[in-house]
């Protein structure tokens, strides 16, 4: 059984608990609860935009899913685990076209670097590879601190930044 919560349909926590308890009573040993980004309870949906923003600002957990899990565990007495698949859920096994596109992006990026062109994202537009300024796609450039742990760790793994 899978319970899903999506922003378009505010959930009723009492109903979620009833569903889980019913499954436990009928012998089910687990219930999967899938919570989408932006999921909202009926109580929160009834708040004004200002009240809801204030509530979100006061939240101590990084996501509503942790609040839901905590409440399920408190009300059912059952262990509750959270798994956030993030971008991996959009993935899957790459096919030939994915590999070709990745190669095209890599080649175009490398050629741009050789020409001294930086601050661009490679994109496919109208069937052709093109350079898009990062300011246009990301709002602003985000710089990596060369002294950061991430850079140090990458170098320890043998990744070159062309500076040594």
Language model regions located:
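Short glycine/threonine-rich loop-to-helix capping motif typified by GTGT followed
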Residues: 45-48, 92-100, 132-139
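Catalytic, metal-anchored helix/loop core of enzyme active sites in primary metabolism
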Residues: 50-59, 63, 79, 90-106, ...
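Phosphate-binding loop/pocket of nucleotide- and phosphate-handling active sites
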Residues: 67, 122-164
């Amino acid at each position: 059984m899978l319970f899903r919560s999506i922003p378009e349909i505010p959930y009723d926590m009492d109903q979620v608990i009833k569903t889980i308890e019913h499954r436990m009573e009928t012998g089910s040993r687990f219930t999967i609860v899938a919570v989408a980004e932006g999921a909202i309870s009926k109580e929160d949906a009834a708040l004004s935009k200002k009240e809801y923003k204030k509530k979100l600002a006061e939240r101590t957990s990084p996501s509503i899913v942790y609040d839901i899990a905590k409440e399920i565990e408190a009300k059912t007495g059952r262990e509750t685990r959270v798994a956030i698949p993030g971008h991996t859920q959009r993935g899957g096994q790459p096919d030939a076209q994915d590999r070709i596109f990745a190669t095209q992006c890599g080649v175009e990026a490398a050629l741009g670097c050789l020409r001294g062109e930086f601050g661009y994202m490679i994109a496919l537009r109208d069937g052709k590879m093109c350079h898009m300024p990062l300011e246009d796609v990301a709002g602003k450039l985000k710089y990596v601190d060369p002294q950061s742990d991430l850079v140090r760790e990458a170098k320890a793994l043998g990744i070159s930044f062309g500076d040594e």
